[in-house]
């Protein structure tokens, strides 16, 4: 059963609708946008806290200036935190043939520990944390820990050269940069630590936190934080406005400096 079919059934049952096809559903969604977005938050169980003067849509004559979920509070990571089971959350297999399986319970523990470490550095809502990292579990965890405290995340792949990273991160003035020791591409190992000093000097000299490409008995600085009981006390998730920044992606930079594309919660 598809999500769309399940959603149609939800509307038919809870909103007394009798949609016969997708076109009817679409017409209803644009004619009654407040009802549509309300139903979406209910169907997907989006955690939203209503405040005084909250509006599902603060309308503007220009569509792109509409303010969705105005004055509602939430946090993206709550969608992850509500699952604290031993179900598989991340399954990683590296080019070095190392395999790593992380349950939702373990994922939440690691995110909690890392967010506690961030707070120990006085990183707060609106501050920027960046990752110069390959596609590994630590990258996901670093992002989620940033979201948990209301900080803003951005990242560059570890195969980016120094200039490409500087062009992006220099626009953000990060408080912390998380890096790995190496990455693999097409079966070959590549070190990229030689880029770090140049990059840091051009983006405001943020503190650096190092991890290692996944391996057996990972003793990297980041993994020591995961294991450190000092950071195991439960951290409260920071509630933010729905439209507060969550992460920044960048355009390709083919027509000048890469453009920041900011995504909210």
Describe each PLM feature range.
Residues 14-15, 77-103, 215-217:
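AMP-dependent adenylate-forming
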Residues 29, 77-81, 107, 111-114, ...:
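Adenylate-forming
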Residues 1-64:
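N-terminal amphipathic, basic-rich helices that act as targeting or association modules
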Residues 117-160, 164-166:
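Conserved AMP-binding/adenylate-forming
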Residues 30, 38-51, 70-91:
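A short N-terminal helical cap/helix-turn-helix that marks the beginning
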Residues 103-105, 238, 246-265:
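Conserved AMP-binding A3 loop
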Residues 96, 179-242:
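ANL superfamily adenylate-forming
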């Amino acid at each position: 059963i598809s999500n769309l079919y399940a959603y149609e059934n939800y509307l038919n049952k809870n909103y007394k609708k009798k949609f016969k096809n997708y076109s009817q559903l679409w017409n209803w969604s644009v004619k009654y946008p407040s009802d549509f977005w309300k139903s979406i938050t209910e169907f997907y169980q989006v955690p939203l806290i209503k405040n005084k003067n909250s509006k599902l849509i603060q309308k503007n004559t220009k569509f792109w200036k509409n303010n969705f979920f105005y004055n509602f509070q939430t946090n993206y990571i709550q969608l992850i935190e509500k699952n604290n089971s031993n179900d598989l959350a991340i399954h990683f297999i590296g080019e070095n043939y190392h395999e790593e399986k992380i349950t939702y319970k373990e994922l939440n523990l690691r995110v909690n520990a890392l967010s506690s470490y961030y707070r120990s550095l006085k990183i707060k809502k609106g501050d920027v944390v960046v990752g110069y990292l390959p596609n590994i579990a630590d990258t996901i965890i670093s992002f989620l820990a940033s979201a948990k405290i209301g900080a803003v995340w951005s990242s560059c792949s570890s195969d980016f050269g120094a200039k490409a990273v500087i062009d992006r991160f220099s626009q953000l003035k990060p408080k912390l940069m998380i890096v790995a020791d190496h990455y693999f591409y097409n079966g070959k190992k590549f070190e990229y630590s030689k880029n770090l000093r140049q990059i840091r000097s051009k983006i405001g000299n943020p503190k650096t936190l190092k991890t290692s490409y996944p391996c057996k008995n990972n003793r990297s600085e980041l993994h020591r934080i995961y294991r450190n009981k000092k950071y195991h006390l439960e951290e409260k998730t920071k509630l933010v406005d729905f439209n507060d920044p969550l992460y920044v992606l960048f355009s390709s930079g083919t027509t000048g400096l890469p453009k920041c594309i900011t995504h909210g919660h």
